[in-house]
UniProtKB/Swiss-Prot annotation:
Entry's localization field: Cytoplasm
Segments of skewed composition (Gly residues): 528-548
Chaperone recorded as keyword: yes
PANTHER family, per database record: 60 KDA HEAT SHOCK PROTEIN, MITOCHONDRIAL
Organism: Caulobacter sp. (strain K31)
Name under which the protein is recorded: Chaperonin GroEL
Length: 548
C-alpha cells in the first residue's frame, strides 16, 4: 500500500479552503447575464470558451493534493445540483464557498463545528420552506419561454424553441439537444411513438419518393416470437382483408415463408401489409411490446399468456390513426389505447425510474416514458464555428433542464433575489445555543453571495444592490443585471425555477457542512524520484520481468 500524507484540524481545513477558493473563484465569474467567459485549453483542437459553471468546475484538477480535496468537494456540489435540477451549479458553488469561508472563520475562533453545522441545517430548512411557499406555478408558454431565455444567458430564440418543444411533446416527452450540421438552430418534433426498427423488406414501401411505408388507420398485430409460417394466421388475415384496412405486424422476427407470403400478397394488392421487428432485446423487448399494446389497444400474442396464433381474432389487434415506417424507424401516431391504461402504465414506469440505481436502465425507462407520453423533440444547435456550437449547446442544455424544473416546482424571482428575500425568514430564528445561532447567521450572510456576485460581474457594487433590495418590501423587487435597472423581476421576466434555487442551497450547505466538520485529511504521498520505476536490470519502466 502506498504511503499517505495526513494533515489535521486547522492545517487540513486551511489547505482544503485554498482549493475551494481556487475552484469557486474560477466558476463564479460565469454567474448572471453579464457573466464573464472562461477559456479552457483542450489537449487537441481549439480552446473552448464557456459560461457554464459545471463545465469550468469539471476541468479543474489541482497539483497540491490537499487543495484538490477541497476543490473536488465543491465540484461535487456543482455536479449534484446539475444532476438533480439541471442548472444552478454556479449559484450552488458561490453559496458553498460563502458558507465554508464563514464557517471556517467561526471554527478558528473556537466555536463547536458540530453545533455550527446544526445551525446551518436548521437555517437551510427554514429558507427552503420559504422558497417553496413563495414559488409561483408556471402555466403559460410565455412563462416557459422566459425561464428558458434566462437560463440560456438571455438568448430569446432558445427560450422560445424550448417552450415550443414542450408544448409539442408535453412535460413527460423527451427533448434532446444535438449539434447541427448547419449554422441554424432548429427544432424537429416526432409526434407519436417512434422506435428504431424499420421495414423488413423494401417491397412493403408505399411511397417510393420518400422510401417509406405509410399506412392510414391500420390494424396492428403484436407477436412476441418469430413468425416463420403464416398458416396459423390465415383466419385473422382473411378477416383483415374483409375489413379493408391495412395491417402492421410487429414480431421478434418475420422470416422465410412468412415474409415471402406477405410480400407476394402486398405486391398482388390482396393485402396492404408491412412487417417490422419488435424493438429492444430480452425483457426490454417484452416491456416495449406491452407499451405498444397499451398505446394501440392491442393484445400481445404470447404463449406465456396462453394465446396461440390460430386463436387470434380481430379484437386482439391494435389500431392507430397512422403508421409510418422508414428503413430505420417506425412511428405510430394516435394509438387508440384507453387513456386510463396509458396513464397507469406511465405511473408504473415513473415508479421504476425512481427505484432503479442504474443510469443505463434509467435512461432506457425515460425513453419508454417519452414514447408513451407524447413524443420526442430534437433541438439541433447550429453555429459558425465548433467553439460557438459547443458553447451554445451547453446553454441550451442548461435552459432545457431549468425549464423542466420550473414546470415541476414553479418559479421565484431570479437574479439571486429569492435567496436574499428568504434570508428575512431567519431574522428571528435562534439555535439551541450560541454556536447554533452563529451557524444560522452564516447562512443568512451566505444568502447575499449570489446577488453580490451577479452585480459585480455586471460591473456594479454588490453591497449597494443588496442594501437597496432589502430596503424594499416587495417580494419581487430586484436588480436586473441585464439592463442594470431596479424592477419588478417577475414582470420583467427575470425568473428562476424554485427547484434550482432550493437544490443549490441544500447541496451547498450539505458539502459545506462536511468541510467545516473535517478534522483530518489523507492523501497519497508524492512518490520519491518520480520515474516510471521498473525493477533494476533493464526492461521498460514497470515491465522489468520482460526480456527484450
Amino acid at each position: 500500500m502506498a504511503a499517505k500524507d495526513v494533515y489535521f484540524s486547522s492545517d487540513a481545513r486551511d489547505k482544503m479552503l485554498r482549493g475551494v477558493n481556487i475552484l469557486a473563484n474560477a466558476v463564479k465569474v460565469t454567474l448572471g447575464p453579464k457573466g464573464r467567459n472562461v477559456v479552457i485549453e483542450k489537449s487537441f483542437g481549439a480552446p473552448r470558451s464557456t459560461k457554464d459553471g459545471v463545465s469550468v468546475a469539471k476541468e479543474i484538477e489541482l497539483a497540491d493534493r490537499f487543495e484538490n480535496l477541497g476543490a473536488q468537494m465543491i465540484r461535487e456540489v456543482a455536479s449534484k445540483t446539475n444532476d438533480k435540477a439541471g442548472d444552478g451549479t454556479t449559484t450552488a458553488t458561490v453559496l458553498a464557498q460563502a458558507i465554508v469561508q464563514e464557517g471556517l472563520k467561526s471554527v478558528a475562533a473556537g466555536m463547536n463545528p458540530m453545533d455550527l453545522k446544526r445551525g446551518i441545517d436548521k437555517a437551510v430548512h427554514v429558507v427552503v420552506d420559504s422558497i417553496k411557499a413563495s414559488s409561483k406555478k408556471v402555466t403559460t408558454n410565455n412563462e416557459i419561454a422566459q425561464v428558458g431565455t434566462i437560463s440560456a444567458n438571455g438568448d430569446k430564440d432558445v427560450g422560445e424553441m424550448i417552450a415550443k418543444a414542450m408544448d409539442k411533446v408535453g412535460n413527460e416527452g423527451v427533448i434532446t439537444v444535438e449539434e447541427a450540421k448547419t449554422a441554424e438552430t432548429e427544432l424537429d418534433v416526432v409526434e407519436g411513438m417512434q422506435f428504431d426498427r424499420g421495414y423488413l423488406s423494401p417491397y412493403f414501401i408505399t411511397n417510393a419518393d420518400k422510401m417509406e411505408v405509410q399506412l392510414e388507420e391500420p390494424l396492428i398485430l403484436l407477436f412476441e416470437k418469430k413468425l416463420s409460417s403464416l398458416q396459423p394466421l390465415l383466419p385473422v388475415l382473411e378477416a383483415v382483408v374483409q375489413s379493408g384496412r391495412p395491417l402492421v405486424i410487429i414480431a421478434e422476427d418475420v422470416e422465410g415463408e412468412a415474409l415471402a407470403t406477405l410480400v407476394v400478397n402486398k405486391l398482388r394488392g390482396g393485402l396492404r401489409v408491412a412487417a417490422v421487428k419488435a424493438p429492444g432485446f430480452g425483457d426490454r423487448r417484452k416491456a416495449m411490446l406491452e407499451d405498444i399494446a397499451i398505446l394501440t389497444g392491442a393484445q400481445v400474442i404470447s404463449e406465456d399468456l396462453g394465446i396461440k396464433l390460430e386463436n387470434v381474432s380481430l379484437d386482439m389487434l391494435g389500431k392507430a390513426k397512422k403508421v409510418s415506417i422508414t428503413k430505420d424507424d417506425t412511428t405510430i401516431v394516435d394509438g387508440v389505447g384507453e387513456k386510463t391504461a396509458i396513464e397507469a402504465r406511465i405511473g408504473q414506469i415513473k415508479k421504476q425510474i425512481e427505484d432503479t440505481t442504474s443510469d443505463y436502465d434509467k435512461e432506457k425507462l425515460q425513453e419508454r416514458l417519452a414514447k408513451l407520453a407524447g413524443g420526442v423533440a430534437v433541438i439541433r444547435v447550429g453555429g459558425s464555428t465548433e467553439v460557438e456550437v459547443k458553447e451554445k449547446k451547453d446553454r441550451v442544455d442548461d435552459a432545457l433542464n431549468a425549464t423542466r424544473a420550473a414546470v415541476e416546482e414553479g418559479i421565484v424571482p431570479g437574479g439571486g433575489v429569492a435567496l436574499l428575500k428568504a434570508s428575512k425568514a431567519l431574522a428571528t430564528l435562534v439555535g439551541d445555543n450560541d454556536d447554533q445561532t452563529a451557524g444560522i447567521a452564516i447562512v443568512r450572510r451566505a444568502l447575499q453571495a449570489p446577488i453580490r456576485q451577479i452585480a459585480e460581474n455586471a460591473g456594479v457594487e454588490g453591497s449597494i444592490v443588496v442594501g437597496k433590495i432589502l430596503e424594499n418590501d416587495s417580494p419581487t423587487f430586484g436588480f436586473n443585471a441585464q439592463t442594470e435597472q431596479y424592477v419588478d423581476l417577475i414582470a420583467d421576466g427575470v425568473i428562476d425555477p424554485a427547484k434550482v434555487v432550493r437544490t443549490a442551497l441544500q447541496d451547498a450547505a450539505s458539502v459545506a457542512g462536511l468541510l467545516i466538520t473535517t478534522e483530518a485529511a489523507i492523501v497519497e504521498a508524492p512518490k520519491k524520484g518520480g520515474g516510471a520505476g521498473g525493477p533494476p536490470g533493464g526492461g521498460m519502466g514497470g515491465m522489468g520481468d520482460m526480456d527484450f
